[in-house]
């Protein structure tokens, strides 16, 4: 919708039938929507391990359930490919299940459950590390929602396993010297006697105005022990 130009969007799939179905859908969409042209989308055959896309050419890349389907080595390569094709400061936007509980091997090795976006779920810290290890300097966790329960009656597990769904943007910013900036919803409000507070590290807090801060900055502000920052 926001890229109404020829080949403004690139769609990649490894299955010929899926590519053909997409072409038919775009032709139908063009007939029903006067603003849409099927050539807005350039469909290419390829896979996540070797994207048929030039280096540093994409503003926004998107995926759904990549982390759940792939195992560690393939996942590392797929993330590296996303990083390669993004422009500097480009964004990889994602939606994936996550789970803070350990999963047994029966669950982890069940290809059907992985394909259903269930048993490949990673803890959030591990999820974020995969992204920062690839070079993404800024990570924004934009939403966390309940997703599924794996119970002993229907799945090979001895305990209830709670799975969340998260929405994340990984931004191809340079990696800061003191480590990545990971945003998980924290904010700071300065309410002191001055017009603003400057931490001399790039953060200026205007009086009584909330500002989103990364976890690293939140810890640094808390360590100051000030009674005029919330």
Predicted regions and their residues:
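A short glycine-rich, Lys/Arg-flanked "PGG" loop and its adjoining helix->strand segment in the class I
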Residues: 76-91
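A short SAM/SAH-binding and catalytic strip from SAM-dependent methyltransferases
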Residues: 59-74
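Class I SAM-dependent methyltransferase SAM/SAH-binding core
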Residues: 1-50
């Amino acid at each position: 919708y926001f890229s109404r130009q020829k080949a403004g969007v690139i769609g990649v799939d490894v299955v010929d039938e899926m590519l053909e179905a997409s072409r038919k859908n775009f032709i139908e969409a063009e007939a029903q929507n006067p603003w849409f042209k099927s050539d807005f989308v350039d469909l290419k055959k390829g896979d996540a391990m070797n994207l048929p896309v030039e280096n540093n050419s994409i503003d926004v890349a998107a995926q759904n359930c990549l982390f759940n389907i792939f195992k560690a080595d393939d996942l590392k390569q797929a993330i590296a490919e996303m990083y390669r094709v993004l422009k500097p400061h480009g964004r990889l936007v994602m939606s994936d299940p996550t789970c803070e509980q350990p999963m047994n091997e029966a669950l982890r090795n069940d290809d059907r459950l992985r394909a259903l976006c269930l048993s490949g779920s990673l803890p959030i810290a591990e999820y974020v590390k995969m992204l920062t290890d690839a070079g993404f300097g800024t990570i924004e966790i934009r939403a966390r929602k309940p997703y599924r329960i794996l119970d002993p009656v229907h799945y090979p597990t001895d305990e209830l396993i709670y799975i969340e769904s998260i929405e994340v943007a990984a931004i191809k910013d340079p990696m800061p010297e003191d480590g990545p900036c990971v945003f998980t919803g924290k904010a700071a409000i300065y309410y002191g006697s001055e017009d603003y507070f400057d931490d001399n590290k790039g953060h200026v807090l205007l009086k009584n105005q909330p500002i989103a801060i990364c976890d690293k900055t939140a810890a640094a502000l808390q360590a100051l022990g000030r009674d005029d920052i919330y």
